[in-house]
Amino acid sequence: MHERPAAVKIKSELGLPGSVSAAPGSYIVLKKGTLPVFLGLGPEPALLEKMHPGYENFLYIECPDLERQLGPSWKQKIPANFTKISPDQLVPENMEQMSFILYTPGLKNFPEFWTDVLARIRLTPEALRSSPDKPASVFIFGNEHSLLVPEIYWEIEQLGLTPILINPACGPDKLCEILRRGKPELVISVNLQGMDQLGEHFAIFNRLNIPVALWMVDNPFHLLTSLKSRYWTRAVIFVTDNWFIKPLKAFGASAVHHLPLAAAPAFFRSTGRIKPELQDKTVFVGRSSFPGNRSFFGACPSYPRLESEALELLSLGQRPDFAWWTRRLNLPLWPGNRVREMGFGAERTGLVWKKICLERLAHKYPVVVYGDKNWKNILPQQIDIQPEVDYYGPLASIYSSSGCILNLTNMHLPHGLTQRHFDVWAAHGFLITDKTRGLEVFPQELAREISFCAPREMLDLIDRLNRDSSLKNQIQAEFYKLIKTRHTYRQRLENIFNLLNIKG
């Protein structure tokens, strides 16, 4: 029985503990040829010739960081018929005869180095050539049901470019095949769709000098738990919540910009009040938790003392949001999953906040909640709980038909806004909302008229608007005009295009 090769402890490019071994399963053949090239040797290079018999000479590329960690004794184990080459020597005329053998633990632990090497190998001369005869295009990772993709697709067409949907799970080889048909002016990824954990897709775009825009709609550090490489710091990042700009830059992100959500085009086409039963109701639309909540936060502990502090702050009209939990727990935001513990605190606090507000509201006014079934386990029976509604279905008519729409902003986004902050007004509805610094994108004299900090203020606000219908109509008209002229997805995309100097 063969002994399992010993593992050598190392530090990954992120400074995390890892290990490498010479196990046979650690090597995969990417391409066959007459001249073998090892993309990483592993800790026992003397074994490789026996593992790949039939060749007289071998070439290899090694990651400088791993080479340094393995030290001089490792170099002495490299057979004399192994010749080191640099990635710059991977040019098309040389690669035709080469057989590439990838040492996979090297890729896993040092992805920034190896994804660039792999991109050089995968990109054929056809992919490197430009296509001047093709119309300017934009790649969008996702499908017609993906978050914001329908809105982005539609508006890109209106701006004179050709949107092309790319399957997020296409893989680097398929991506290169797509690129051979034509290179886009830009790649857009919403919430890191299509951005694999090691950065193989990004390295391909980077090699072709194609800018990649990462639009992080949700909490960026929650999204980044899926990535195992720093490649995201080299993309152009857009965040809907400007609180995250400073911490993202602290991790080395070179370009981070504030790009809020906006109104979806379909909501401007709302047909008006077609649900008269809602005209005297306050309506809340939203889930009790985001999909996949349990698995995402499954390993997170609770912090009862901090949760008690958070409840006290809620009673004082303050927001114990993600920023507050970050200060109190002071755990690393990235890499790793500890950030989820701070998010879990914000998630639990946010649910309590929604429960408090909806219960207080239901004591005085008729309330309808459109959401998931779990609300029935959380809210009192006098609240009318209706099933979730399709975003592209009856939601616009619910917004326009209701007496008012209540928004309660997610605690995961300290300065965040929701889609409702824009869509409700576009549909000729009326919104009241808890106050966050995200409202600073609107004129403050308008934002003050619709926002509250504490449940008591929420009730006073509704009372005032019910007494003064002319004021309510005036606010509604001003917000509709504001959203239509300054807060559409077309304008958000124009911001991206102008920043990156992309023309239709």
Model-derived regions, located:
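Alpha-helix C-terminal capping/helix-to-coil transition sites in glycosyltransferase folds
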Residues: 32, 183, 233, 400-401
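Short, surface-exposed amphipathic charged segments that create phosphate/polyanion-binding patches used
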Residues: 73-76, 94-100, 227-232, 270-281, ...
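Nucleotide-sugar donor-binding catalytic core of glycosyltransferases
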Residues: 113-155, 254-413, 433-439
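Catalytic binding pocket for nucleotide-activated donors in carbohydrate/polymer assembly enzymes
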Residues: 133, 140, 151-160, 164-168, ...
